[in-house]
A protein has these predicted regions:
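Alpha/beta-hydrolase
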Residues: 5-160
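Short beta-strand/loop motif that positions the catalytic acidic residue
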Residues: 167-169, 174-176, 180
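Active-site nucleophile loop of the alpha/beta-hydrolase fold
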Residues: 2-4, 208
Length: 232
């Protein structure tokens, strides 16, 4: 949620960037919402800015631990126990980040954004994303500094299919459920298109949700036929 104004205050909000603000197009669940494309562009840019701010907090924490580790190596544990103890505990310390409001994709409520067959809402909301954004649980809410940087940061993580798929050269199939509330068809196609394999297959599983409930046999048959044609 890019409208978070203070990482230490879950209620501190920049109204102009709040997707749950009526002036920006939000309506209470289950009414559909409509977000202006120009506002949405500012929103997406602000999301990147917030990730950068969290990255800076995480990197500063890691740098402090590294610096303390370098200092402790120069200390005589037997000769200066107090100084060694202080720097050693700083060196091994792991900061935990509480990352508030992580369920804030306007596409959850505005189905005209990357239109597909998905319903309103999110896999992680029960059912209202507004409540899930502020409620307990959610994605990446409590992370170590290294955990945030390596897995969730869109700027620092190396776990990016855009970077890794070009190195995948084996035959590749992607079965995309068209009613997935989390992954857009555009994104699924981009994943396949970026693959380094000469043999790629993209299949849309019409009406299937994220975990393929009600469509798993169909998905299994698709994958089995694909494997049989290449490896039987």
């Amino acid at each position: 949620d890019p409208s978070v104004a203070d990482e230490n205050d879950p209620f501190a909000t920049v109204p102009e960037l709040d997707m749950y603000e009526p002036d920006n197009g939000w309506r209470p669940w289950p009414e559909p919402c409509t977000y202006d494309p120009a506002w949405l562009a500012r929103y997406r840019a602000a999301q990147v800015d917030r990730v950068a701010r969290i990255d800076a907090i995480a990197k500063a924490s890691i740098a402090e631990s590294v610096d303390a580790g370098q200092r402790v190596r120069g200390l005589d544990k037997a000769g200066d126990v107090a100084a060694w103890r202080e720097q050693r505990r700083r060196a091994v310390f792991t900061q935990y980040l509480t990352i508030y409001r992580t369920l804030a994709d306007p596409a959850y409520l505005d189905l005209s954004i990357d239109a597909d067959e998905r319903p309103m809402g999110s896999l992680f909301a029960f059912p209202d994303p507004f409540e899930a954004n502020y409620g307990r649980g959610g994605l990446a809410r409590t992370m170590t500094a290294r955990g945030w940087l390596s897995t969730w940061s869109g700027l620092s993580s190396h776990a990016k299919l855009a970077d890794t798929m070009p190195r995948v050269t084996v035959p590749t199939i992607l079965v995309h459920p068209t009613a997935d509330t989390e992954i857009r068809m555009r994104q699924a196609k981009e994943i396949v298109d970026s693959a380094g394999a000469a043999d790629t297959t993209y299949v849309e599983l019409a009406g299937a949700p994220h975990y393929l409930e009600g469509h798993r046999r169909e998905a299994l048959a698709i994958v089995a036929d694909w494997l049989r044609a290449r490896f039987a």
